[in-house]
């Protein structure tokens, strides 16, 4: 006894410790696992002991306490009851101690009983101390454990075995106590004894099933019955890795009496009610019941019996490893199963009969609860929680984008946001393991890892081995391979295994790996897709799928279209099909579409009647046939029929009389859908002119209240001509055949031609202004429009109503006028003044067909409709209980003899048959009969008075004799001069007999006869050399164009006439240039004639080209007196060296009195050279033209007007150069027509200047004889050829008196002086024009190298001034080329255009004349230049002014203005530009690509047109611009613009 008490002490302590330990563990683990189960759908419980350590402090302090019996940890059987589930993926386990969670999981009932017994035997103080100690130390000691990851079954097994061991130990010691314990609770002990291996399995299944299928039961067991048991080792080997390798567990001997006590008792077993063991026994009597919806009791069985398990755990049976293991498994106490009635919520006792509804998991205690129970409403779905991508850790907002994947070594699935994240995660998780198979390692071609190869791709004759689907997807993406990939998930579709599914959508065949991907793709994309049969547009998510014989899935809008499609396929195939009535294989003659989309085929009409009789039977006799009340539709397809407008026939579907209103509406909708679908495929319209059928958009004509349809515009026009469709033309006011009718401001306007319509619109634009535009909805023209921004585009409407309608149409909320379907309407039609909108062309055809049919209403149709309504409106009592039957069946093939032909003919002919219904009891029969239209009523005749009056007509006969004229004169009056006959010797061939080659025959022989040739020989020429020289001069002087030659010839004649006049007639007269400069004369003439008009300006300008020529022709002051000429040269002898008299160092514009008017700042110039606007609100400036005061000349030899150009410098330089040239000619150094080098040493001329050797050339034309010429010192006496050749040599050989070369600006100054001298002395030659082209080329080459000189005082120096060009008539309106030169000068100076490219960008559209009102009501006229918009890229020929680069968005090109010159109108740029416009053609004044035009070669001064429509040659423009860039004022303006740009940059 003492020993037993000693042993019982440790056992008590062990039970106290183990009870406290596992109470705490179960509560902590249960709370966490309850939370995890609520989050995990698969109920995968997660371990909670990862963060706990298993080392416990020893109570006694001994090192070998683990081997002692007192160690409660190793010997505790309750340790195996810890509900821990091992996870294969250790990365997901992140747990901590959760003491604050309230556990909602109840432990097993056996654990509660054991704990209750332990508490009675233990001391309260020891229990409180042990529990406090364990609560303090237990969480800390289980921090480092990592091997407690076995499945719950493992711990249950250890727990039950240990309990059995301890039960055997206390068998011999406390037998009396155990017997009393069993007597206190007989039901528990009895249930334990009844447990066998079969009952153990059933009890576990019941427990698991209740946990899975009965969520309302409060008890929950966490044992996974589906876990496959294996052969487990002992507790020491199972937990040995967790503690130590040398742990030994104390083994106790088993007691055989305990097993005998636990054996079942036979007496108690006989008292238990036997229940059926399987579902076949209790459901055997239920198979005969066929009425759907009838209450069925699926099972009746005991609550605690074994048959409950197979009913609740179908497909959820555990697999046992061996039969011996069942003996080792302990029995589960029956008290763990507590089932309550779903109706009254009472607890079902053991052995009580329970009832279960078929297909439901709920149990009921009686049939009363079973019949009175109503299904509770479904719980609202839990709020969607945001899922996180396992790869990139981003929240997946859209649940449709979630990709769940389950890996090989885990039972849980992971979520990913995209396929790329899934592939990345797989690569990260894929271990780098070398797999050696027969010492051969295979490497993946994508990830370069040694792994098992799953795919091999032969690409470009190279086999690529891939280890996974992710690598296979990457390989396809990298090489742009369009292989069999699923459109939804991107996976590979193995077409060889039959897993590849095809979907026909949007005209393309898309591949899918499974039917679920097809459904997901339809739901995800939800595209508007046309039906495969009727082509109506529906969302793909709402359409019905059907897979045809080729394996392609097609989409249909309704079951009706699907049925019709199947009928069409069966009909077109022509194969033999089994009849649904007689089961005979034959070609089907009749088809019936059922409500479920299936097709019933019949071989004859008798089979149809037999099949129809099946539906006349009472309900319940045959449940395999779907009743027609669910909405059958009889499909009739008229083969070869065509729906035509204008009296054509339409195919109709006979309506089916049905019992309920809902079914009637369904059938009516189905019949209408079928009718629309088939009519669309065959509908055609009939042209009113050519009577042809067409299926295109019709051409409509609204005439006399009717709409006429035509197949095209030609038929419409021909119909108008034939039927005289005439109306008053709105423009020409003549009644003609209507060509087009357009709506203006709500009224229809008719026009006879396209030209009248355009002219009328042009007149409206003038009256209404620029707002004469068209409404975007009704297409009518209105003066007032309402604007609205739709889709980023501004639309204009005539009224608010049109704007609202267009808005509804734009947002696809409008309905089609034909099919009444809402959506995108892409077609429109104007029908009787209203705009109709349609889905597509088919809807237009349907609408026009319906309108044409509905226009002439038929009495026959009206009668039929009324009869149908009367027949359907029968007694409601009879129609309520009747069963609908098949109304009509139509054959698709030829009608057999047994078929009634009345119905089929009525349908094929398009007539609407009358419907008569005969109702007999529960069955009804409906027949269709064709009723002929009633005969027309007799015509009413009335008396009518007739008044007949003959039409008389008077006929008159007029006789008139026919007269003829005949000449009978006797005297011959010669009307033409007599022809003098001149004998001309003509050789005549006289034929003679041929003597067969034996005699000589005459042969024609030509004799030259001299003929007189007229030649023009000048009488003043005495020698041959002079004649040849004159001829060559004439050839060189005369231009190639005949009109220009006539003009020059006239000018020479005028000059010769002036030279012949005597000196007495050369009195002092006011020269032309004095008139040009005389301010009083100008004010007298110009001020009174200027009116601003272009034509009056051209006439009133006193110095036009025409007046210039007339003035030279009339005046006679060309020849001056000899003494005055000598005096002039004597006075001009001082003007010898230009550069010496005007050195650049002494230049000062202020001292010269050149009062330059202050000019407002111009716009800064952009990169492209055009002026650009300033920012910060600076006011626009106007370029003012600076008038110059006319300075009186201080030098002698100039005109009396005091011009600043001293032309005597040029004259003297020419004279000195000619003297040097003639001196060399006398020495034989110069020859005409050859090129010869002079002496290498410089020579001194008689004036003391040394001239260098130069090249001399006269003419390069062939036939020119080499001869020597002598230039004249008097430039006025030089001919055109001499002047042209001399100027070419002059600019190259002229030197200063000291022998130095002239600067380029000085040479141009001398040439301008020569030009001015020629004009002053009556010569109209302009040496800067095309006849002197050789001289112009050489001069341009010389001036190109010149750059302006910057003086130390900051001024720019150039000897060429603006005034010089005005004086020598290079600026003005004297000729077309001079006027172009003037415009070029103004644009260069004031618009800062410095190269040819910038000038070529000018156009008439960019230069406009404007007027502005100034102070004191004065008006100012100016020219505004709008620079064109420039592109981003820079061109090489653009000159950038300014250092700062601005963005194009910051600057908008603004026009630069140039004001008129009111001080001197002859130099006004505005007036000159207007005169230029007056001489241009009207066709070029609005062009935006040309400004400088080519002068006409044949024009005269009084010609209305000076310029052609072609732009001037860029080479000519470059020659003119080179001379303009020599002007000092031009460079000053450019420098000012550049300095202003710098100031703007500094201010910014």
UniProtKB/Swiss-Prot annotation:
UniProt xrefs under InterPro entries: DUF3504 (IPR021893), TRASH_dom (IPR011017), Znf_MYM (IPR010507), ZnF_MYMT-QRICH1 (IPR051284)
Extent of Basic and acidic residues compositional bias: 1124-1134
ZnF (MYM-type) residues: 362-402, 414-457, 464-499, 510-544, 554-592, 600-631, 708-742, 749-788, 795-829
Stretches the record annotates as Disordered: 162-189, 1124-1183, 1231-1260
One Pfam entry name: DUF3504
Biased composition annotated in UniProt, kind: Basic residues: 1160-1181
Record has Zinc as a keyword: yes
GO molecular function: DNA binding; zinc ion binding
Top-rank lineage group of the source organism: Eukaryota
Modified residues (N-acetylalanine): 2
Keyword terms, alphabetized: Acetylation, Isopeptide bond, Metal-binding, Phosphoprotein, Repeat, Ubl conjugation, Zinc, Zinc-finger
Residues joined by cross-link Glycyl lysine isopeptide (Lys-Gly) (interchain with G-Cter in SUMO1): 250
Glycyl lysine isopeptide (Lys-Gly) (interchain with G-Cter in SUMO2), cross-linked positions: 140, 149, 195, 201, 232, 250, 260, 271, 273, 289, 327, 400, 428, 430, 1035, 1061, 1080, 1127, 1431
PTM sites of type Phosphothreonine: 107
Polar residues bias locations: 1237-1260
GO biological process: cytoskeleton organization; regulation of cell morphogenesis
Reported tissue expression: Expressed at higher level in heart, skeletal muscle, kidney and liver.
Record-listed Phosphoserine modification sites: 110, 122, 162, 197, 242, 1030, 1064, 1071, 1181, 1256, 1539, 1542, 1547
PANTHER family hit by this protein: ZINC FINGER MYM-TYPE PROTEIN, ZINC FINGER MYM-TYPE PROTEIN 4
Stated role: Plays a role in the regulation of cell morphology and cytoskeletal organization.
Misc: The 3'-UTR region of the mRNA encoding this protein contains a motif called CDIR (for cell death inhibiting RNA) that binds HNRPD/AUF1 and HSPB1/HSP27. It is able to inhibit interferon-gamma induced apoptosis.
Protein name from the UniProt record: Zinc finger MYM-type protein 4
Gene giving rise to this polypeptide: ZMYM4
